[in-house]
Amino acid sequence: MKIRVGFGFDVHQLVEGRDLWMGGIKIEHSKGLLGHSDADVLLHAVCDALLGAANMRDIGYHFPDTSAETYGMDSKIILRDTIALIATKGYHLVNIDATICAERPKMNPHIPAMKACMAQICGCDEDDISIKATTTEKLGFTGREEGISAYAVCLIEK
C-alpha cells in the first residue's frame, strides 16, 4: 500500500451577475464567483489537492482557463474527471479535509449538502469528507467580501 497527501488552494473574486457555486451546490447570494468555469473554489482546491497527491500537476494544467472546452464548465465534472485521472495511476481517495473562508454568505448551513454532493462524485462515504467554514474576522479581501477562498488536504492510496 502506498499513501500520499496533497494540498490545494483556490480563490476567486465575488462579482454581481454570477451564481455562487460551492462544493457542487448552488447557494443563494447577491454575488457569485468570477472565473472561467463556474468558479467553485472548494471543488477546485480539492482537485488541486488530489492532483498534487498523485504528482499529476494541477487543475490549470488539466483544465486550462484558456480552453473553450472548459469555459463555463461545471466543477462537478472537473472533480469527477480528477478522480478518474488519479485512478489511472492506481490511486483512490481516502479522505478530504477542507476549509472555506468567506464572510458571507454563511456556509455552515450548506455543508451537509456539499458533503453529499462531493461523496457521490468521489465514490466515497460522506464521513470521508470534512468541510469547515470560517471567516477572516473582516480582514483582507475575504473580510471585505471581495472574494472567497478554500483550502483542502487529501489522502490517497493505492
Region locations from a protein language model:
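C-terminal edge-of-domain segments
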Residues: T142-K158
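RNase III-family endoribonuclease catalytic core
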Residues: K2-P112, C122
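N-terminal charge/polar-biased segments
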Residues: M1-I3, E157-K158
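Glycine-rich, mobile lid/loop segments that gate access to catalytic sites or pores
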Residues: M118
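Short acidic capping loops at alpha-helix termini that bridge into adjacent secondary structure
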Residues: D125-D128
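Short acidic, Gly/Pro-enriched loop/turn segments at secondary-structure junctions
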Residues: K138-G140
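Pyridoxal 5′-phosphate
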Residues: I131-T135
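Short, low-complexity, polybasic intrinsically disordered segments
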Residues: I111-K115, E145
